[in-house]
From Swiss-Prot:
Species this protein is from: Mycoplasma genitalium (strain ATCC 33530 / DSM 19775 / NCTC 10195 / G37)
Catalytic activity: a [peptide](out) + ATP + H2O = a [peptide](in) + ADP + phosphate + H(+)
Membrane-topology descriptor: Peripheral membrane protein
Name of the protein: Oligopeptide transport ATP-binding protein OppD
GO BP, one annotated term: peptide transport
Residues annotated to bind ATP: 58-65
InterPro entries with a match to the protein in the record: AAA+_ATPase (IPR003593), ABC_Ni/Peptide_Import (IPR050388), ABC_transporter-like_ATP-bd (IPR003439), ABC_transporter-like_CS (IPR017871), Oligopep_ABC_C (IPR013563), P-loop_NTPase (IPR027417)
Gene label: oppD
């Protein structure tokens, strides 16, 4: 079985441009709960370039995970609406529940924050990696046949080309699922992710590995399917700092080697700074600032971004008290009027409590939704902690370029 993708192709004027792999417009995700409607995501746009690492950062409850789970149909009982969710020129808003399986785990892989719940405790790790290879290969084979048949019926190719390509597809599939080739690929992946004595460990169960190693195995399964996109949803939260660094380095190496696109979710803005190419800052179900990682950390513009950066522990003065953001995220059953961050924002203007700010564009890639960027707004300097961080970031970037 395969998904008849021709039924889900976007219109010609909506086709992806500029090396994009994902384009989401005006995404809303609501949940019907006992006390009413929970407005988890409130009209966000996301653009993701092929081969990039895109970070989404914000406090717990800001809507990060819900946003990306909508890309793989993981939000059970959610009311999801969007003007467009274009993944590789397929509008995934049109997919029915039973159709998600043709994309999930094949074209898009998901890495959760707790590897213990991602792995089957009754199956060896070798069997789990091999299963991912077999299932993804089979789905890609049937999908390729379906797409080829569509091309023939649409007169994009002639019968001779159809037969030739069909034979090629079948031969490729048969080679991929040969047990000897699956075993070889499994060993190569496990060795690459740092599993010592991989051939022997193929028969080991998840419980025989540490938390860091289990997360590496989850990454191995995600990569084994040869996806175009990997969603890493706080994949290092349950790991200690040294293991975090190793796992992030591994993910980056896989991106560079396989040209996989990665969406990285975190509440830790310092991880985002060291790992991502492009950043979306999210608060109360909305994007409040976005830009290249260099722009966000050398010229942060939204007070919420300032607050996140200010909360990074001071490296030089270890006796300096930690900075925290006062207050809590508002109740999304009844989202506040105006800017949702206004009640926690010491720089808030009167207009913030009445009207939500539009995006003010600073560069083609950098923009922020704050009234402080309005031409008539008073000039406000960011906190000293942010200014210090900007100085350090600029020095680090200069050193990196040398």
């Amino acid at each position: 079985m395969a998904l008849k993708r021709s039924n889900f192709f976007v219109d010609k004027d909506q086709q992806l441009k500029d090396n994009l792999i994902l384009d989401i417009t005006d995404l809303h995700v609501n949940f019907k709960v006992k006390d009413g409607i929970l407005h988890a995501v409130r009209g966000i746009d996301l653009k993701v370039e092929r081969g990039s690492i895109v970070g989404i950062v914000g406090e717990s409850g800001s809507g990060k995970s819900v946003s990306v789970k909508s890309i793989i149909g993981f939000n059970d009982n959610a009311q999801t609406k969007a003007k467009l969710m274009n993944f590789k020129n397929v509008d995934i808003t049109k997919l029915k529940k039973h159709q998600w399986k043709y994309y999930r785990g094949t074209y898009v892989s998901y890495i959760s924050q707790d590897p213990l719940f991602s792995l089957n405790p009754t199956m060896t790790i070798g069997k789990q990696v091999k299963e991912a290879i077999y299932v993804a290969s089979k789905r890609r084979y049937f999908q390729a046949k379906s797409d080829l048949k569509f091309a023939l019926s649409n007169k994009e190719i002639d019968k001779k080309t159809y037969k030739s390509k069909l034979k090629e597809i079948k031969q490729t599939y048969q080679q991929k699922i040969k047990p000897i080739n699956v075993e070889k690929k499994t060993l190569e992946i496990l060795q690459f992710i740092g599993i010592n004595d991989a051939k022997k460990r193929l028969k080991a169960f998840p419980s025989e590995f540490s938390g860091g190693m289990r997360q590496r195995i989850v990454i191995a399964i995600a990569v084994a399917t040869e996806p175009d996109l990997i969603i890493a949803d706080e994949p290092t939260t349950a790991l200690d700092v040294t293991i975090q660094a190793k796992v992030l380095t591994l993910i980056k190496q896989l991106r560079d080697l396989l040209n996989i696109t990665i969406i990285f979710i975190s509440h830790n803005i310092s991880l985002i700074a060291n790992f991502c190419d492009f950043v979306y800052v999210m608060y109360a179900g909305k994007i409040v600032e976005q830009g290249l990682v260099e722009e966000i950390f050398t010229n942060p513009l939204h007070p919420y971004t300032w607050a996140l950066i200010s909360s990074i522990p001071e490296q030089k003065d270890k006796n300096k008290p930690l900075t925290s953001i006062p207050g809590v995220i508002p109740n999304m059953l009844t989202p506040p009027k105006g800017d949702a961050f206004a009640s926690r924002n010491q720089y808030a203007l009167a207009i913030d409590f009445e009207y939500h700010p539009p995006f003010f564009e600073v560069t083609k890639t950098h923009k922020a939704a704050t009234w402080l960027l309005h031409p008539q707004a008073p000039k406000v300097e960011p906190p000293q902690a942010v200014i210090d961080n900007i100085t350090l970031t600029k020095k680090a970037l200069q050193f990196k370029d040398q």
